[in-house]
C-alpha cells in the first residue's frame, strides 16, 4: 500500500502503524471529540475501505492508537513484582523524553495528558486498560513499602501524587514551553521520591 501514503511517512512503517500514528497525532492536534474518520482519510490520502480492513470502527481505531502511544510504545515489559520504585521512576522518566517526540514530530506534553484524561472519561475500554496499568504501579508502591524502600504512607496517596505529577494538563498562570514542563515533571518526581524514600 506504499502508493497510498505521502513519502514523509517512510516505507519502514506498516500501513496499520501509519494509520495509528496519524490518528494519534490528529487526536492531539484537534482533541478527542473533534477528530472524524474523514480527517484521518484526508491526512493519509486513503479510502475508508482501506481503514476498515484494519479496524472495525472509529472507537477501536482510537483505542488502538492511544494504547500504542500511551503504553505499548514507551513502557517495555517490566517485572512489576521485582522492580523497585526508583527503577519504575527511571523508566517513567525515559518515557517522558520519548513521548515528546513521535518520529520527529514534537508532542505537547500538556495536550498529551489532556488526551489521556479524555480517553479515560469517554472510552470505557481504555479506562479498563488504564486501571490495569495503574494496578501494576500500585503493586510497585506496595512492594516498595514492604521492602522498606519508602516510608509507610498510604498507597493511594503515593499513587495519586505520582499521577498528579506525571499527568498535569495545565498551568494556572501561563502556558510554559514544552521543555520546561518536561523538566518540571522530572524534577518534581525526583523531589517526591526524595521525600518518601526511607533514609
What is each PLM-predicted segment?
Residues 1-4, 90, 94-98, 135-147, ...:
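C-terminal peripheral helix-coil segments that are non-catalytic and often amphipathic
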Residues 1-13:
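N-terminal intrinsically disordered/low-complexity leader segments
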Residues 78-79, 121-149, 160, 190:
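Amphipathic alpha-helical packing segments from all-alpha helical-bundle domains
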Residues 18, 26-60, 64:
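Helix-turn-helix
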Residues 15-23, 40, 65-69, 73, ...:
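Generic hydrophobic, amphipathic alpha-helix propensity
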Residues 100-124:
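Amphipathic alpha-helical segments used for helix-helix packing
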Residues 151-172, 184-191:
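Hydrophobic alpha-helical segments that form the core
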Residues 64, 77-106, 158-162:
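Hydrophobic alpha-helical connector segments
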Amino acid at each position: 500500500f506504499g502508493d497510498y501514503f505521502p513519502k514523509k511517512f517512510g516505507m519502514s512503517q506498516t500501513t496499520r502503524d501509519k494509520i495509528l500514528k496519524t490518528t494519534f497525532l490528529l487526536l492531539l492536534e484537534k482533541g478527542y471529540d473533534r477528530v472524524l474518520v474523514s480527517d484521518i482519510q484526508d491526512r493519509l490520502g486513503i479510502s475508508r475501505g482501506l481503514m476498515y480492513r484494519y479496524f472495525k470502527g472509529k472507537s477501536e481505531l482510537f483505542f488502538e492508537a492511544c494504547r500504542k502511544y500511551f503504553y505499548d510504545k514507551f513502557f517495555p515489559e517490566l517485572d512489576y513484582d521485582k522492580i523497585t520504585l526508583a527503577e519504575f521512576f527511571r523508566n517513567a522518566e525515559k518515557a517522558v523524553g520519548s513521548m515528546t517526540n513521535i518520529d520527529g514530530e514534537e508532542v505537547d506534553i500538556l495536550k498529551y495528558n489532556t488526551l489521556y484524561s479524555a480517553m479515560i472519561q469517554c472510552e470505557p475500554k481504555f479506562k479498563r486498560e488504564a486501571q490495569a496499568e495503574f494496578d501494576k504501579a500500585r503493586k510497585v508502591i506496595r512492594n516498595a513499602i514492604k521492602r522498606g524502600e519508602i516510608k509507610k504512607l498510604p498507597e493511594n496517596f503515593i499513587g495519586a501524587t505520582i499521577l498528579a505529577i506525571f499527568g498535569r494538563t495545565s498551568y494556572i498562570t501561563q502556558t510554559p514551553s514544552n521543555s520546561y514542563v518536561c523538566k518540571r515533571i522530572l524534577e518534581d518526581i525526583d523531589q517526591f521520591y526524595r521525600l518518601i524514600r526511607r533514609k
